[in-house]
Amino acid sequence: MPLKREDTERALQAMEACQSAGDEGFRTRAERLLTIFQSDLFQALLDIQEFYELTVFENQTAGRALTPGLKYRYHDEETPPLQHSPAHLSTGKSAEMLHLGDSGHAPIDGIHAYTPQMHVSPAKPVLLPSGHAPYYATSTLMNGMDGDVEYEEITLERGNSGLGFSIAGGTDNPHIGDDPSIFITKIIPGGAAAQDGRLRVNDSILFVNDVDVREVTHSFAVEALKEAGPIVRLYVLRHKPSAEKITELKLIKGPKGLGFSIAGGVGNQHVPGDNSIYVTKIIEGGAAHKDGRLQIGDKILAVNNMYLEEVMHEDAVAALKNTGDVVFLRVAKTLHQHHHQDAYNPPDITSSYSPHMDMSDYPQALSPSSPRRYSPIPKGLFLDDDISREPRRVVIHRGSTGLGFNIVGGEDGEGIFISFILAGGAADLSGELRKGDQILSVNGVDLRHATHEQAAAALKNAGQTVTIITQYRPEEYSRFEAKIHDLREQLMNSSLVSAAASLRSGKRSFFIRALFDYDKTADGGFLSQAVSFRFGDVLQVFDCSDEEWWQAGKLAPHGELEETGYIPSKRRVERKEWSRLKTRGREPVSGRSDYIVSYETVTQSEVHYARPVIILGPSKDRVNDDLLSEFPDKFGSCVPHTTRPKREYEMDGRDYHFVSSREQMEKDIQSHRFIEAGQYNSHLYGTSVQSVRQVAEQQGKHCILDVSANAVRRLQAAQLYPIAIFIRPSSLQNVLNISKRLTEEQARRALDRAVKLEQDFIECFSAIVEGESFEEIYHHVKSVIEEQSGPYIWIPARERL
């Protein structure tokens, strides 16, 4: 029960009576206690005690429910929030408050329960676990942050999946600016924290049980969480969101479009825990810059009549790009920014809205983005203790790109493992599957001893909603990966040594890449054991002695054998295609049989650079722009060369490599030092092999190249093997759907160019993508780049079929 002033007075009277009758030792101890009771400090503490009781009573009579021991909030309209800095939250020689037990208000370790929304001025006590003296803080800022803060005590029961959250920060690795606090970076779906529902992303942890983690290293905080036991009490500080003002803007597009960049969206958060679409850049001279009202940090709530709340990033991009000349924006402006612009480094995944610039502005439009300190991979450690090793049930809803993960294994009963999670795919968005998971069953089908083919079939035929029983087994997967690496090394060595002999002998194994789609059900007279495949699939041929059918197997993206059977021979493919063309009244160009392509021989190679990317076909410019603006940490552009004189505001090596003599550049072009070059306004412009290599090797980025298909072979000759992706339109209407701003005549010309491009350069393509919309095509392009980034890739072999 709380201490009353009248109780103290009765205690003093009793102590004085005992003092006169007791022995000498008792009298000495009683005098000390009386001195304490009569001191000014003790009287002040009694005053504070009465103040709090009065406040509690007023709040209770006003009908406010008290939740003792659970939430501690401070919302002081008169005084700014505490400064959350270890120097100001120390337990040193600060004013000490005596915490007295109260069964009604302090059930946990004698912590005094303060009522929510208590108005205490001018100072506020920081609540600490028992044994720690609170400090009366009068500072006004939390590491440079404005706005209100709140404190909360959250008790979690560690479950099978641990505590269910990830952390970042610490004195050795600050997460936000120079703040050493331990921040929550992710709430794991289905975990203890998610089920409790109170812990939020960006909360900072002050204490774990009785352990102070306000100014500690990251590893210390990790150990504190691991050693906290089955019941864990977290004392967290949270920065309350600022108020927002909703406003309507009208922008009129100019030569530079709307003139701003955005970031964010579902599955692509700009601010952790927030799916909003944020303005990240205002382009000078653009419509937004001239209007002057839109600012960095504003949220875009709607574009014209389309709301952008809880939408994918691609949907927001499409909404802004598919607008007319007059655009109405509904914008939320934050009245008080919590974070300094440079203090917080979320993923800079943005999309800009400006049309293509003329040749003189080309370098500025596609200049390499400066490296960002933030990685899309959270800097926080996902605690091993929080990753359950027990079997768990996961439900995945199949998306437009399938389930969004690859599998390996299935030989000699070794199990089926997840080897790759596609960024933005169904598995990635669920957050419940990870590399190293073993799949035990799919929709009730036991896969513990399944072959790779059986597992692939079970996943393919599982329907839209797939229930997976999986178990995290990283050690087994690591051993499996090591085995795959050894096999890959043997594969690379054997393919190089025996490639020439393989082609001469019908009994030797070799590798080919398919240059066409093959559907066995559409092939009249097909074998029941035939294997269907798509353009770009790699096949291992075991026996090519038969003139019509080769015994072969299809390889999965990571090199393991996926399916075996028979494929049509080169002779069969070319004969059937020749007959088809003649039936349609078309002859191969100049009567050449090499016009018809079937397979090319390939060998596996290991690369130690980011492969350049060449997009070909309709909408290639839009794809290039979106990749550069959306993922500046992964994609870059190289600096071109020119013989044009340098302008006053330009810098050599940043805007262009300015070549002093036209003769020198012509000589370099003839020496094959350029992958492409041309003339504009009597000046030479070109992209050199060295410029591409600098982006690929030194910056470690995929160099986006706006070049013709001829550049593919030149890059291959320079040992820089690009990812060349052809966007294949299926019809005139498909072109119009992909590029909505084209007229019908422009779309027809684009279709004709695409058909000719495929005829002339199909063997140069790494992959062919198709789709009903630009968004679908863009998603496929990103998937291809992800799969073919390396380090192990298939490259053309010197030997020909």
UniProtKB/Swiss-Prot annotation:
What Pfam families does the entry give? Guanylate_kin, L27_1, MAGUK_N_PEST, PDZ, PDZ_assoc
Provide the protein's localization. Cell membrane; Postsynaptic density; Synapse
The PDZ domain covers 153-240, 248-335, 393-474
The residues covered by the L27 domain are 4-60
Its record classes its membrane topology as: Peripheral membrane protein
Keywords of this protein's UniProt record, alphabetized?
Cell membrane, Membrane, Repeat, SH3 domain, Synapse, Ubl conjugation
Q: Which GO terms describe its cellular component?
A: neuromuscular junction; neuron projection; postsynaptic density; postsynaptic density membrane; synapse
Transmembrane helix as UniProt keyword: no
On modification after translation, the UniProt record reads: Ubiquitinated by MDM2 in response to NMDA receptor activation, leading to proteasome-mediated degradation of DLG4 which is required for AMPA receptor endocytosis. Palmitoylated. Palmitoylation is required for targeting to postsynaptic density, plasma membrane and synapses.
Q: Which CDD domains match?
A: GMPK, PDZ1_Dlg1-2-4-like, PDZ2_Dlg1-2-4-like, PDZ3_Dlg1-2-4-like
Per the database record, which ranges form the Guanylate kinase-like domain?
610-786
The record comments on the domains as follows:
L27 domain is required for targeting to postsynaptic density.
Q: What does this protein do?
A: Postsynaptic scaffolding protein that plays a critical role in synaptogenesis and synaptic plasticity by providing a platform for the postsynaptic clustering of crucial synaptic proteins.
The Swiss-Prot or TrEMBL record describes its family as follows:
Belongs to the MAGUK family.
Q: What is this protein called?
A: Disks large homolog 4
Q: Which organism is it from?
A: Danio rerio (Zebrafish)
